[in-house]
A protein has these predicted regions:
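Carbohydrate transferase catalytic cores enriched for Leloir-type hexosyltransferases
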Residues: 1-312
Length: 312
């Protein structure tokens, strides 16, 4: 049986940063394993498994907020208690082993999955974008996503393509002012659309109508949005950041981090070269098809059984 027990995360995190108490056992009764699916492994007398999605707080502390900066210390404490680690990519697995000195036999990579969304309406996407041709970026606006570089790339691209627009859809996270400043300084700001958070219907519509999908991140432990775009048949340009080469494979065009010129060139090739675009769409669909949530769930279930068996 699985018990999903929501708790007051922040107060407990503050305590678990400093001590291995209180034990989570007091709230959930008898159990074989506790799984913390988002960096935090609650202390327990049973076996522990924690999911580590990335090491932003270690590699790029300037790109992490105060809450996530606490994660490395909590990971170390859990490892000292004997916790197992699930990572969402082989890249992060290697990082966890190297940075924390974790036992390789107790750090297991299981990729995330993607479910194909119902087809969106391109006409709805065009209405949201204010035009039929647009480059799309989806997700929370925060420094790690490096959207100002995308704005600079679009400035170059828009000079060569007068009909193209840039659409950024996602809620403002911390540090979102940098994107606002980049848009305000852009000579192409009239063709840049910021939509804020969108619901699933509008997300699907935006993907259905997009000429290209851009993912210019500085660092990623997995990178689900480009896989979702590939699954929807949208050609993707991403950066060679963190796990993205592993996850995207040959299903995306990859460019160096922070290189607006290279990003603009890759996007231009997609919107200008129909043959390349079609080839990239087909490769992207093949890559995305490998990320199946049912397979992920089976592998995680096997891992939980394995972890539970380590405590008598």
């Amino acid at each position: 049986a699985v018990v999903d027990r929501p708790m007051a995360a922040r107060p407990l995190h503050e305590m678990w940063r400093r001590t291995d108490h209180p034990l989570v056992d007091r709230w959930i009764g008898r159990h074989d394993v506790v799984w913390g699916p988002n960096f935090v492994s609650p202390p327990t007398r049973a076996a522990e498994l924690m999911t580590v999605h990335d090491l932003t707080a270690v590699n790029f502390p300037e790109l992490a907020n105060e809450f996530t900066l606490a994660f490395p210390g909590m990971i170390r404490r859990a490892l000292r208690r004997g916790a197992w680690v699930h990572t969402v990519s082989e890249f992060v697995r290697d990082e966890v082993i190297e940075h924390f000195g974790a036992d390789p036999d107790r750090v297991v990579a299981v990729h995330l999955g993607v479910r194909s969304a119902p087809p969106g309406r391109p006409d709805r996407g065009a209405a949201l974008a204010g035009g039929n041709r647009y480059v799309l970026a989806l997700g929370t606006v925060e420094p790690r996503k490096d959207l100002p570089t995308l704005v600079r790339a679009f400035d170059r691209l828009a000079d060569r393509d007068r009909d193209l627009r840039l659409v950024v859809a996602g809620a403002d996270g911390w540090g979102a002012d940098a994107l606002g400043a980049a848009v305000a300084a852009s000579p192409q700001r009239a063709r840049i659309v910021r939509l804020g958070r969108v619901d699933d219907r509008d997300r699907a519509a935006l993907l259905a109508g997009a000429a290209a999908y851009a993912f210019p991140s500085i660092y990623e432990g997995f990178g689900l949005p480009p896989i979702e775009a590939m699954s929807a048949g949208v050609p993707v340009v991403a950066t060679r950041a963190g796990a993205l080469p592993e996850v995207c494979g040959d299903g995306a065009d990859l460019v160096p981090v922070g290189d607006a010129e290279a990003l603009a060139a890759a996007l231009h090739r997609i919107v200008d070269d129909d043959g390349h675009r079609s080839d990239l769409v087909e490769r992207g669909k093949r890559v995305a098809a490998a990320y199946d949530w049912d397979v992920t769930a089976d592998r995680l279930a096997d891992l939980l059984v394995r972890v539970a068996g380590t405590r008598g």
